[in-house]
């Protein structure tokens, strides 16, 4: 099948000739005499190996491109795993970060912090227009998505405790979900391979079935404090939630007095084609809590947990905190990023490039049915669905100068920056097609 045939096509001498007709491996993996290889060796001697890294040493970025230590240019359809949504080395991001660094980098949360206050105001005003959350929202700033989700779990349980007392602490999550790697967020991440060796995890969590409205009442009951769901699943395999599923979740949460948490860490802030991924159901399935992170400051570490006024009223000084949460540099940049990502210019480009990508994906499905079985996603959070694990496809695309990401369920994730230009999309698609041609021979 796919992997076996593709490996044979590379190794056999006859197939090598046919293979080279379609692809030119201009970005081969570094050889022992290169600067990149020496850096990779040093990393292995000094850093704990928890990442399956590509053999690429990123030296700099510019827009939708990454450059390695040998000066080779790559089209970046990973965006730092949906982080650099405004592209690499955005001039205004760089200017604002440098200016804030020259004034104040950190003062602790003992003092008021104007950049954090300004960012919270921008986010809250945006949600007032684009989300159905009742009443004004309030925000807790953290450093990443995992911390934002941990905060969401704590706040949801605290709100349930204050209203209902002990015994209402259950958290419901879904198959193929990914919410983080700390003990709490790992407990509500579905993939068992991430959990092996780290048990026991958080008690009183229940896994339910994603996109199955009929099954919700089996899992959401009087003991449920919160339901956490991704409006578009990312790492577990690109899968948008059906509107009727989110509506059913809202109704189930209302029935038992549970909080509905939308994890928009990967799908939010414009990547779905809307600034807030849940806004397509804002009038009928608004959340009580939203978590965001990845693109919030275009690469600077930041996360945010946004809650309704009812939940905020149950959280008091000393009940949560973060040393670096609300960092002035990240928040100063974040204010610009939220405004820019919510602009009509960016959102129109997301929808335009979505059409360009999916039009070619339709061709791929028709031309290469032995390799591609379909695609899914919203906006520029797309998954090309392979018939078998796509590791060889991703490797060969990289060796032609295109960076892609694996995803669950045999997906290849396609995550360009949201301001990506037409010619970059076209070139990336051409590399994908040449790789598919080669692997299909």
Swiss-Prot record:
Keywords: Amino-acid biosynthesis, Aminotransferase, Arginine biosynthesis, Mitochondrion, Pyridoxal phosphate, Transferase, Transit peptide. Pfam families: Aminotran_3. The keyword Lyase does not apply. It comes from the Eukaryota. GO terms for biological process: arginine biosynthetic process via ornithine; L-arginine biosynthetic process. Belongs to the class-III pyridoxal-phosphate-dependent aminotransferase family. This is Probable acetylornithine aminotransferase, mitochondrial. It comes from Schizosaccharomyces pombe (strain 972 / ATCC 24843).
